[in-house]
Amino acid sequence: MKPTLRRKLEALVERHEELERLLSDPKIVSDTDRFRTYSRELAQLAPIATTLAEETRTKADLAAAETLRTDPEMRELAEQEIAIAQAHLTTLDEELQRLLIPQDPRDECNLFLEVRAGTGGDEAAIFAGNLFRMYTRYAERQRWKVEVESDTPGEHGGYKEIIARIVGRGAYSRLKFESGTHRVQRVPATESQGRIHTSAATVAIIPEADEIADISINPADLKIDTFRSSGAGGQHVNKTESAIRITHLPTGVVVESQTERSQHANRDKAMKRLKAQLIESERSQQATAEAMTRKLQVGSGDRSQRIRTYNFPQGRITDHRVENLTLYDLPNIIEGDLDPLIDRLRQEHQAEELARLSNAP
């Protein structure tokens, strides 16, 4: 481990010890807000303190075993203990580095998934449908709930646009690296001469706004329109203008909701999406600026960035953000087996974060 990371660990352990002292202070105990804040921070630092203490004990065991190795009668046993201790130290070192990476506070959030057809006409809409189905299948494997907010079907299948809310533990942490342009190379069903066409679709993963991280929106900045829903709900939706369209005038962001029977419920849903969009837009601008400075590839979340190619004739999928990340398992991945990709992306992101921490003063 680099000395800079070791110093950060030691500082965090000192803070852990300080928090333990503070939480035994009667003045802190009687102050509910401070007690809660310090308790939360202590809980976050506890895994680092525990793992570092385990590392200290293992180093002591290693030193004792190395001393025993000088005794001919104990040498064989000592070498076994040395091998075990060294392997354990390697594991602990990796775990400590992982624990140093700041946790994204949005990781446990629900999210909005937006898939839109890009270049490629009907084939792009069909591909957008393939992507949405892929994410839906993955959500089913994770036992997450998928709620379609709005959709515009393509003329020959798929979707020109589909927006859904995904609800489940750790949903954003698993899918946050999916934002960007996805490209497909295959022979369309309508292609009579067997030529391979290239089409594209864009994916946006937007964390649902946490009430704690809520933002204030001036009602004067909103233009609210009502219209008749074309979605589910039977005859009722055709009789009343229950659907809502909200335009945020300063930014031009437009959101709609038409899946609920009442105008009030659709308005609430649309406002949730609007808040999420505005928060994510601000975060994305900050992340893009950081990415330009740090040359960060995985975590920027830029929707215009071409991130992945799905080559159907070769059964190949390539993620362009990670060197040599090509998998020849497209049939399973497109059916929702995304973990091999997601795990590699998360590992790459962790490596980038560790590099940043190592170079920080």
Curated annotation (Swiss-Prot):
Its main location: cytoplasm. Methylated by PrmC. Methylation increases the termination efficiency of RF1. PROSITE patterns: RF_PROK_I (PS00745). The modification N5-methylglutamine is found at residue 235. One of its GO terms (molecular function) is translation release factor activity, codon specific. GO terms for cellular component: cytoplasm. Disulfide bonds: none annotated. InterPro entries: PCRF (IPR005139), Pep_chain_release_fac_I (IPR000352), Pep_chain_release_fac_I_sf (IPR045853), Prokaryotic/Mito_RF (IPR050057), RF-1 (IPR004373). Peptide chain release factor 1 directs the termination of translation in response to the peptide chain termination codons UAG and UAA. Belongs to the prokaryotic/mitochondrial release factor family. PANTHER family: LD18447P (PTHR43804:SF7). NCBIfam families: prfA, PRK00591.1. This is Peptide chain release factor 1. It comes from Xylella fastidiosa (strain 9a5c). The lineage of its organism: Bacteria, Pseudomonadati, Pseudomonadota, Gammaproteobacteria, Lysobacterales. The gene is prfA.
